[in-house]
Amino acid sequence: MRKTKKISFLIFWVVLISIIGAISSQQCNETGYFEPWKTYDTNRRQILTSLASKVVDHYGFYNSSIGKVPDEVHVMGMCIDGTEPTVCSDCLKVAADQLQENCPNQTEAYTWTPHKTLCFARYSNSSFFKRVGLHPLYMEHSNVDIKSNLTYLNTIWEALTDRLMSDASSDYNASLSSRRYYAANVTNLTNFQNIYALMLCTPDLEKGACHNCLEKAVSEYGNLRMQRGIVAWPSCCFRWDLYPFIGAFNLTLSPPPGSKRNISVGFFVAIVVATGVVISVLSTLVVVLVCRKRKTDPPEESPKYSLQYDLKTIEAATCTFSKCNMLGQGGFGEVFKGVLQDGSEIAVKRLSKESAQGVQEFQNETSLVAKLQHRNLVGVLGFCMEGEEKILVYEFVPNKSLDQFLFEPTKKGQLDWAKRYKIIVGTARGILYLHHDSPLKIIHRDLKASNILLDAEMEPKVADFGMARIFRVDQSRADTRRVVGTHGYISPEYLMHGQFSVKSDVYSFGVLVLEIISGKRNSNFHETDESGKNLVTYAWRHWRNGSPLELVDSELEKNYQSNEVFRCIHIALLCVQNDPEQRPNLSTIIMMLTSNSITLPVPQSPVYEGMDMFLPSIKSLPGSVNDSLIDDLVPR
């Protein structure tokens, strides 16, 4: 028992020392100075002294000013979400003391202070409220390099940072509190190792400004290469570690029971030295044991197999695939909503029995696709394979698919132009990731409104990518005898000659943009009274006649920016050009959508004369040539 107490006591101090040394981010701006004991110094001391109590009184966030120009002092303080009032107060008192001690005569400074939690304090002689502060930069990381599995780890890293940026910059709380612009996340790197990360912005920022600040923080550091670090500016902070850190991950720092004796400075130093020796010895021992194990044991299972769910868990989550939980059905199988024991919601795709893959292939390909993570892609959480069952598990997206809003008269009113534009841009970003930025090159081949899911913030997420490998469809990279996809979205060269490329997705994207603008389906446009054989020819006719805004959904009632809508129609018509070489790629499309300084080419007629002979057979189909999603994946 006595030995256990000593070990617990040693562990307590090891943790404490690691936390104290983890980050120390006081940054004094050297652009201005004041004279000690003058009015500015007095005002600074007064407002920093009261900062802790003010932040607690205002539920975790506070900003104010004191004095008159040129001795006016502006201040801001906050604690991360969930911090107890006393802990928040203690942290901010430490932060205020550090600022005054380490920045004795600077007129501007800030600190992100880890003291039982993470808190922030900033002061300046000029107002900074609602302004993004990107100077001075503070960046620190450990000296421990990560040297193995870098490709795999950086894939996880990119997905984690994208997800955190999206979550942290979500404007889900309208009040200026510490709950706004804050996200913490734990992600599996291996079966035995996690990465812990936190992002937050000061709550006074606009949503876009927060995202830009965090994006700059991520790009400032680059890929995952050190075991821990922090990047901070006056307006945002990004911290990560391979071990949980205090405040964000519910750690506590209370000494072991019975250890109430006072500790001398000498004893503390002895503990520090002993800790260093113990860590060195243990590290060496671990390396030796691992090396021996590698020589004698078979290779450890890849981290990807942690993605596997057992069938009982899936059946319990979906009430044994109850029809009342069914979300939809396609060529590859049925999709159900599920709720796991911890209350988290999932979407379950139960694949049909036609898949030709074996167990190992299914595991490998699913794990490969699961690494493809982006804020505008539906996340693949894992799989289940028992007996004849092959099941994919996805994140659950609450607002279902775009088509259920866009083409439903009672719901389309919820899609104002701002939301539609966000969906257009977000979808483009998701497809760009698949085409260019993912570890694989992916051609979706069934991009349509029903494959664009909408989250709680109406942020678009591209669904059903990666199924070609998982389902083992017989296809080649450049052409296929089996035309797959949904009628109305298929490019001419693919439909007539079986040739597909990234430009096939661009064509589908152009059709989708026209649908989003008009609120009309291209696939059954021939059934309407509108002039034109389909939505594409109808849009071209209005463009040619100088009346493109006639295409706009009447539900919008002129509540849109004409120039922005006009530009989107222009881009859509460029995407549906007959010649694939004349269609822009997704990176160009995003620049066209987000920058008015780019001059757009003049579109040519998108009407493909040879298509008429194919239209009767297409129109006779109830939903698609193959209602499933097929895509093409090519290792980079």
Curated annotation (Swiss-Prot):
<keyword id="KW-0675">Receptor</keyword>
<dbReference type="Pfam" id="PF07714">
    <property type="entry name" value="PK_Tyr_Ser-Thr"/>
</dbReference>
<comment type="similarity">
    <text>Belongs to the protein kinase superfamily. Ser/Thr protein kinase family. CRK subfamily.</text>
</comment>
<feature type="glycosylation site" description="N-linked (GlcNAc...) asparagine">
    <location>
        <position position="105"/>
    </location>
</feature>
<dbReference type="InterPro" id="IPR002902">
    <property type="entry name" value="GNK2"/>
</dbReference>
<keyword id="KW-0808">Transferase</keyword>
<feature type="binding site">
    <location>
        <begin position="327"/>
        <end position="335"/>
    </location>
    <ligand>
        <name>ATP</name>
    </ligand>
</feature>
<dbReference type="InterPro" id="IPR000719">
    <property type="entry name" value="Prot_kinase_dom"/>
</dbReference>
<keyword id="KW-0472">Membrane</keyword>
<keyword id="KW-0732">Signal</keyword>
<feature type="glycosylation site" description="N-linked (GlcNAc...) asparagine">
    <location>
        <position position="250"/>
    </location>
</feature>
<feature type="domain" description="Gnk2-homologous 2">
    <location>
        <begin position="138"/>
        <end position="245"/>
    </location>
</feature>
<feature type="topological domain" description="Extracellular">
    <location>
        <begin position="26"/>
        <end position="266"/>
    </location>
</feature>
<feature type="modified residue" description="Phosphoserine">
    <location>
        <position position="450"/>
    </location>
</feature>
<keyword id="KW-0418">Kinase</keyword>
<keyword id="KW-0325">Glycoprotein</keyword>
<feature type="glycosylation site" description="N-linked (GlcNAc...) asparagine">
    <location>
        <position position="63"/>
    </location>
</feature>
<dbReference type="InterPro" id="IPR011009">
    <property type="entry name" value="Kinase-like_dom_sf"/>
</dbReference>
<feature type="glycosylation site" description="N-linked (GlcNAc...) asparagine">
    <location>
        <position position="262"/>
    </location>
</feature>
<protein>
    <recommendedName>
        <fullName>Putative cysteine-rich receptor-like protein kinase 33</fullName>
        <ecNumber>2.7.11.-</ecNumber>
    </recommendedName>
</protein>
<keyword id="KW-0547">Nucleotide-binding</keyword>
<feature type="transmembrane region" description="Helical">
    <location>
        <begin position="267"/>
        <end position="287"/>
    </location>
</feature>
<keyword id="KW-0067">ATP-binding</keyword>
<keyword id="KW-0597">Phosphoprotein</keyword>
<feature type="glycosylation site" description="N-linked (GlcNAc...) asparagine">
    <location>
        <position position="149"/>
    </location>
</feature>
<feature type="glycosylation site" description="N-linked (GlcNAc...) asparagine">
    <location>
        <position position="29"/>
    </location>
</feature>
<feature type="modified residue" description="Phosphotyrosine">
    <location>
        <position position="394"/>
    </location>
</feature>
<dbReference type="GO" id="GO:0005524">
    <property type="term" value="F:ATP binding"/>
</dbReference>
<feature type="glycosylation site" description="N-linked (GlcNAc...) asparagine">
    <location>
        <position position="188"/>
    </location>
</feature>
<feature type="domain" description="Protein kinase">
    <location>
        <begin position="321"/>
        <end position="600"/>
    </location>
</feature>
<keyword id="KW-0677">Repeat</keyword>
<feature type="domain" description="Gnk2-homologous 1">
    <location>
        <begin position="26"/>
        <end position="128"/>
    </location>
</feature>
<dbReference type="InterPro" id="IPR038408">
    <property type="entry name" value="GNK2_sf"/>
</dbReference>
<feature type="modified residue" description="Phosphothreonine">
    <location>
        <position position="486"/>
    </location>
</feature>
<dbReference type="GO" id="GO:0106310">
    <property type="term" value="F:protein serine kinase activity"/>
</dbReference>
<keyword id="KW-0812">Transmembrane</keyword>
<feature type="signal peptide">
    <location>
        <begin position="1"/>
        <end position="25"/>
    </location>
</feature>
<dbReference type="InterPro" id="IPR017441">
    <property type="entry name" value="Protein_kinase_ATP_BS"/>
</dbReference>
<dbReference type="InterPro" id="IPR001245">
    <property type="entry name" value="Ser-Thr/Tyr_kinase_cat_dom"/>
</dbReference>
<keyword id="KW-1133">Transmembrane helix</keyword>
<dbReference type="GO" id="GO:0004674">
    <property type="term" value="F:protein serine/threonine kinase activity"/>
</dbReference>
<feature type="glycosylation site" description="N-linked (GlcNAc...) asparagine">
    <location>
        <position position="125"/>
    </location>
</feature>
